[in-house]
Each structure stands twice: as structure tokens, then as C-alpha cells.
Amino acid sequence: MDNADPNEPVYPCPICGRKFVKSSLEKHESACRKLATLHRKPFDSGKQRANGSDLTYAAIKKAQNEKAKNGGVFPRPQTNWRERHGNFIDAVSSSKRVDYALKTGAPLPPPPKTAVPSDYVQCEYCSRNFNAAAAERHIPFCREQTTRKQGGKSSAGNRGLTSNNYRSLPSKHEGRKQESSSRNGSAERKTTTRGRDGSLSRARRDDSNDLTNRRKSLETRSQLTTGQANNRTTSLSAGTRPALPPMTPSSKRSSSAKRDLPPNPTTHQRLKTPAPKTTTTASASRSGSGSSSRTRTRDESRESRLSQAKSNSRNNSRSRIF
């Protein structure tokens, strides 16, 4: 190959049309003739790219077809970069004005207007703006929601509650008026009387007489209740206690004397009748005997202690002598 002359003429292959030197064209023709007779399927690079990736074969095939339509070149997306750049510059300048106003104490500038991109699509139902891909999803959903709200589809449970099927309830003040009118009507019915000629005549109510009668009835009831309460005897039931009499020398007795008294003496007996002498003497003798026995035991214990101490002292003195 190094000895080949660059000025040597080349000849095209009659099968594939490529050009070769005369020496290599003979070798190429035999190989190219064999390949032309074979019918191999063309290699699809889209399937190889689709394996092990998030892309689908249909999306890759669609891109290849678009590329073939445009002469092997992908169409560049039309972007409104100039408009976006202008919006960005306006936002930066407005923020600088706010910072300057905060530092100097000047009044704050008005907020910048939010510019909607020109390629956005406005929804005719909610008047919001979306890009083309989002508008395709949003507009059908928004249309369905608005038709559902405007149609006023009532649920099956509320069909019975229509204006024709139920009577509207009265308001708060109307209910009070109806109650007062019904009461007045019942009172008027009671006071109506029939005359001799058959005509109905209503008797006039005297409010002052009614008030006096009610007061009298209340006074009589209160008097009856107070009289009954005074006439009741004091009982020892649960929750009530009889009034205790004043303390007198005769009532100040010992516990032993109170035990010998009758079980349920009345208040008059306690005040008038003194306690029997026999019981007092017996109780006094009992109390005296009890106190004398206690003093005897104390004296005996003291004497025993003294005698024991004396014996101990004698034993100690003898042990010292011997």
C-alpha cells in the first residue's frame, strides 16, 4: 500500500458504485457480488437503543420517521427565549428597586406584573394558563367539573327534599308568634259565653283580680306549710336532730348515771325529774372502788421496788466487806 502511486487511476464497482484501484477492484467485485445475492434484513438501531432504557421502541421509531421526513435533520423546537430573557431582567431590576427602597427609606415600588408566556394556552373555564402539554390534560377535566357544578345533579338521598314534597319550617320569630296566638286563642275560647239571644259574647278579663287571687292562694299555701312544720314533732330519723335543752347541773351526770336512765326519756323528764339517788350512789361506789384498787396496786408496786433495792444494797455492802 505504501508503494501505491497516488496518481493511479481508480475504477467504479459495477455493483455498489464505489471506486477502487484496478488491483483491488478485482478482489472487491467477487465479494460484492456474493453480498448482493444475500437478502439480509437491515439492522434496526432503534430496538438496540430501546433495550435497557426508559424509552419505548414506538417513541424511537416516531423520532426516526420525523428525521427522515425532514431530510435527516431533527426540527429544532421553537422557543421564545427572548421573551423569557426580558421577563428575567424585569424581575431582577424590580428586586434591586426594593432593596434600594429598604436601605434609603423611600416608598416601596409597585409589585411587577406577572407576564404570561405567549405560548401558553388559557383555559376557557377557569381562566388559568398552561403550556400545550398541560392544557391537553387540564381542559377536559375542567370542562367536566364545570358541567357537573352547573348541571346541579342532586343525589338520590336528597330527591325527596324538594319544595313540593315538604313544608318549609317557620323561623324563630314566626314560631313565637304562632305560640302566642294559639295561647291567646285558647284563653279567648274559655272566656266566651253565649247570651240569651244566641249570640256569643266575650267576657272581659280583669287582670288585677287574677293577680290578687293568685297572691292570696300563695299566702294561704305558705301559712299552711309553716303551720304544719311547727306542729310536727321532732323525730330521730336520718337527717333530722331534735333541739338540745340548755345545760343544767342536774343534766351534767356521769356516763354511768346516764346508762341507768330509761332508754328514750323526753325533754320534759330530763329537765324536771332528777336522777334517782340509788343509781348515783351505786355509780359513786363503783367509781370509788375502782380508784381505790388502782391506788393499792400502785402502792404495792412501790413497796416491792423499795424492798428489792434495799436487798440489793445489802448484798453489795457484804461483798465489799468480804
From Swiss-Prot:
Lineage, uppermost ranks: Eukaryota, Metazoa, Ecdysozoa, Nematoda, Chromadorea
Residue segments, region Disordered: 144-322
Amino-acid positions noted as binding Zn(2+) 2 in the UniProt annotation, renumbered to this chain: 123, 126, 138, 142
Membership in a protein family: Belongs to the ZC2HC1 family.
Presence of the UniProt keyword Cytoplasm in the record: no
Keyword presence, Cell inner membrane: no
Zinc fingers, C2HC/C3H-type class: 9-38, 119-148
Cofactor(s) it depends on: Zn(2+)
Biased composition (Low complexity): 278-294, 311-322
One GO MF term attached to the UniProt entry: zinc ion binding
InterPro entries noted in UniProt: ZC2HC1A/B-like, Znf_C2HC_C3H
Residue ranges with Basic and acidic residues bias: 171-219, 296-305
Organism of derivation: Caenorhabditis briggsae
Keywords noted in UniProt: Metal-binding, Repeat, Zinc, Zinc-finger
Pfam families linked to this entry: zf-C2HC_2
Binding of Zn(2+) 1, residues: 13, 16, 28, 32
Bias type Polar residues, positions: 148-168, 220-238
The protein's name: Zinc finger C2HC domain-containing protein CBG14627
